[in-house]
């Protein structure tokens, strides 16, 4: 074995424990506790393996006093390393930096660059202003290590201002040092990884814990046929034998096959209250444990008792690595008051018509060494229903889900709950999601904001500063969608071609609440579009179909059949969704001008191309009435639903950008043009301001 091989093995072992090679790291993660009992994590350090082989490691941390972010890269090369930040993962317009240690002099170099306007325009371009400061760098026979920093906001039009959003972090490895004048990024290896740069991240090794055990929960050979575009599959499992109460400290996904070929879109593990329904046979649960499972949310196939499986304990979405909790909180399992059964729900998304057999699930990490607080997960946002509507052809259209005082005043403890983290969830049209917080008529700082949401990269947003939510507070999940290239309305639903607007909130102390949702009241939804009655169905029947997932055939024996069928030709999967939609079965009788038209057909004829009309619809849905639901763990619906108006409050105003040039960062053409434009514009603006002041003084 060569000396280089030995060094490589040593480096790999060190990195596996989150240590930086050749570095004496003085930062020790700690935390403060404020007067409300909320934890504020300080001095945290993130360390991420950027590739699948451990050739490129990126470490970073925030220095809030300096408004700076520090980076350290350790790369298996004696050539160059590239690092970049992008909203969409493309090299074009990316904020980039090239790094290397000169082979001749040993001098470390960090070069601030940006991607050309078009990828075909050539290699990255050097920035006029260099905003990365190199701190240290060295190399040995196999590896290059560089440490550098930059301001979070540099006021350079070619640098992306860093934030809590999800960024696509680009990386590249080159065999040789860059040749003078040649900034070619295309090295021997390159890739992209979605990261949240402002979030700490906890792992099994964040704090020394003895006695950690694992529990693997998977489905058994679920077959996904080519014809299945969307499938929700549920499997009941029994808690393993435990010696008293334990704490779940984290969980990871167990995915079948390679990531790029996997059809698993979303997974949730729920607690089941097996004694919730009178007359239920307790022995049925053990029978279900031995079965392979069945289709979820089916009136015909899903046992009614499974409705009691409503409290999440583990959540995974596409692009996530799972979650580990901070050292003072753990999700309880087992013990005298714990549940015995859990339900694993897996959402399969199969748009390409693949045939596969799946055995995915979770690996649960737990310990008998109990932590200070019992933690829980609750779901908040828009109730999944076709009453959530997103018009076609929209660059930005918002929907909101409200968790209001009907839940928080009743279920939250006097001192409130403390939010640890949140997973934001929508489907393909989602672009921006935030979890907003309102108290006493004033909106506080948003708890979570991701203005660069990507449904393919739904990582947990771990909070550096926990947020207290008190009884009487509102939580508002606010989602923005883009449907520029869609020709028909998009509705709320379970397929990725339909939409959701949810936040999975991890918090403590645990309360007996699993969900807090809202939706547009059914009657108001139809009246919004001047529809008041359907053939042979009164509006109460229609409301029941939406609220309780009732079968249309139970109400429609006398209903008029005027289903809107797609045009002749090949039927797309979107056509199938529209054909099966309840809105496509409801035939309008009042008003007369719309009679004999399905409600779906009626929606398709509305002037969605008119921005004033669409804006009125958006605002009417947001500021109008909302039906709120408080789902309690011990009962399927113990707190009655309530119809409320959107709360009146003073909205939170984001602080103005510290940098003038950032006013134009949304305009990609300007941002990627010549920096001379910004220089000229800034000088002109300053001159105008000076002239204005002189005029005022005169």
Curated annotation (Swiss-Prot):
Binds 2 copper ions per subunit. Disulfide bonds join 272-309, 403-516, 479-501. PROSITE patterns: CU2_MONOOXYGENASE_1, DOMON. Its main location: secreted. Glycans are attached at residues 36, 140, 221, 465, 538, 561. SMART domains: DoH. InterPro entries: Cu2_ascorb_mOase-like_C (IPR014784), Cu2_ascorb_mOase_CS-1 (IPR020611), Cu2_ascorb_mOase_N (IPR000323), Cu2_ascorb_mOase_N_sf (IPR036939), Cu2_monoox_C (IPR024548), DBH-like (IPR000945), DOH_DOMON (IPR045266), DOMON_domain (IPR005018). SUPFAM superfamilies: PHM/PNGase F. Residues 54-174 form the DOMON domain. Residues 1-20 form the signal peptide. Its cofactor is Cu(2+). Keywords: Copper, Disulfide bond, Glycoprotein, Metal-binding, Monooxygenase, Oxidoreductase, Secreted, Signal. It is found in: Secreted. Cu cation A binds at residues 265-266, 347. GO terms for biological process: dopamine catabolic process; norepinephrine biosynthetic process; octopamine biosynthetic process. GO terms for cellular component: extracellular space; secretory granule membrane. It comes from the Eukaryota. One of its GO terms (molecular function) is dopamine beta-monooxygenase activity. Its EC number is 1.14.17.-. Cu cation B binds at residues 425, 427, 500. The active site is at residues 232, 425. Belongs to the copper type II ascorbate-dependent monooxygenase family. This is MOXD1 homolog 1.
């Amino acid at each position: 074995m060569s000396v280089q091989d030995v060094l490589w093995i040593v480096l790999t072992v060190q990195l596996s424990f989150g240590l930086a090679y050749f570095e004496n790291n003085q930062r020790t993660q700690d935390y403060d506790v404020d007067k409300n009992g909320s934890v504020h994590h300080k001095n945290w350090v993130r360390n991420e393996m950027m590739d699948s082989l451990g050739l490129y490691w990126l470490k970073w941390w925030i220095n809030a006093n300096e408004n700076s972010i520090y980076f350290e890269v350790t790369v298996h090369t004696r050539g160059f390393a590239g690092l970049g930040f992008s909203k969409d993962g493309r090299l074009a317009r990316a904020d980039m930096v090239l790094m290397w240690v000169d082979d001749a002099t040993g001098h470390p170099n960090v070069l601030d660059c940006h991607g050309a306007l078009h990828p075909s325009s050539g290699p990255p371009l050097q920035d006029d202003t260099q905003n990365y400061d190199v701190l240290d760098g060295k190399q040995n026979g196999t590896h290059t290590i560089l440490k550098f920093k930059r301001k979070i906001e540099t006021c350079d039009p070619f640098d992306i201002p860093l934030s809590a959003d999800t960024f696509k972090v680009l990386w590249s490895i080159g065999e040789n040092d860059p040749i003078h004048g040649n900034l070619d990024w295309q090295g021997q290896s390159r890739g992209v990884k979605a990261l949240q740069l402002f979030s700490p991240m906890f792992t099994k090794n964040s704090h020394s814990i003895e006695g950690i055990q694992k529990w693997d929960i998977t489905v058994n050979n679920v077959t996904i046929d080519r014809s299945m575009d969307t499938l929700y599959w549920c499997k009941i499992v029994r808690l393993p034998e435990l010696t008293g109460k334990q704490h779940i400290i984290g969980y990871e996904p167990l995915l079948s096959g390679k990531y790029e070929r996997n059809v698993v879109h979303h997974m949730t593990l729920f607690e089941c209250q097996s004694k919730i329904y009178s007359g239920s046979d307790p022995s049925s649960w053990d029978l279900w444990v031995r079965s392979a499972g069945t289709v979820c949310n089916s009136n015909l196939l899903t046992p009614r008792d499974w409705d009691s499986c409503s409290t999440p304990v583990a959540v995974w979405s596409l692009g996530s690595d799972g979650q580990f909790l901070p050292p003072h909180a753990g999700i309880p399992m087992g013990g005298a008051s714990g549940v015995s059964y859990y339900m694993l729900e897996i959402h399969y998304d199969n748009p390409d018509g693949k045939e596969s057999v799946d055995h995915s699930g979770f690996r649960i990490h737990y310990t008998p060494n109990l932590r200070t607080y019992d933690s829980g997960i609750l779901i908040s946002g828009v109730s999944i229903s076709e009453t959530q509507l997103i018009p076609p052809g929209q660059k930005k259209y918002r929907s909101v889900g409200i968790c209001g005082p009907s839940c928080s005043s009743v279920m939250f403890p006097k001192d409130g709950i403390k939010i640890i983290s949140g997973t934001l969830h929508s489907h393909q049209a989602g672009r921006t999601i935030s979890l907003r917080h309102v108290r006493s008529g004033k909106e506080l700082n948003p708890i979570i904001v991701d203005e660069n949401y990507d449904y393919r990269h739904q990582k947990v947003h771990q909070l550096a500063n926990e947020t207290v939510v008190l009884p009487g507070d509102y939580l508002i999940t606010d989602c923005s969608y883009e449907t520029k290239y869609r020709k028909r309305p998009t509705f709320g639903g379970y397929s990725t071609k339909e939409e959701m607007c949810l936040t999975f909130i991890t918090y403590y102390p645990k309360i007996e609440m699993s969900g807090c949702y809202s939706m547009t009241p059914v009657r108001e939804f139809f009246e919004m579009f001047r529809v008041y009655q359907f053939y042979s169905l009164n509006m109460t029947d229609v409301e029941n179909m939406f609220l309780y997932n009732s079968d249309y055939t139970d109400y429609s024996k006398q209903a008029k059949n005027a289903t809107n069928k797609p045009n002749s030709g090949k039927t797309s999967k979107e056509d199938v969704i529209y054909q099966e939609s309840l809105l496509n079965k409801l035939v309008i009788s009042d008003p007369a001008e719309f009679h004999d038209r399905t409600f779906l057909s009626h929606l398709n004829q509305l002037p969605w191309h008119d921005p004033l009309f669409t804006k009125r619809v958006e605002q009417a849905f947001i500021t109008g009435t909302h039906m709120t639901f408080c789902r309690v763990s011990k009962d399927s619906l113990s707190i009655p639903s309530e119809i409320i108006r959107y709360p009146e409050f003073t909205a939170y105003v984001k602080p103005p950008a510290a940098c003038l040039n950032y006013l134009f960062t949304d305009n990609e053409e300007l941002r990627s043009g010549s920096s001379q434009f910004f220089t000229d514009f800034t000088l002109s603006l300053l001159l105008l301001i000076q002239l204005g002041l002189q005029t005022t003084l005169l």
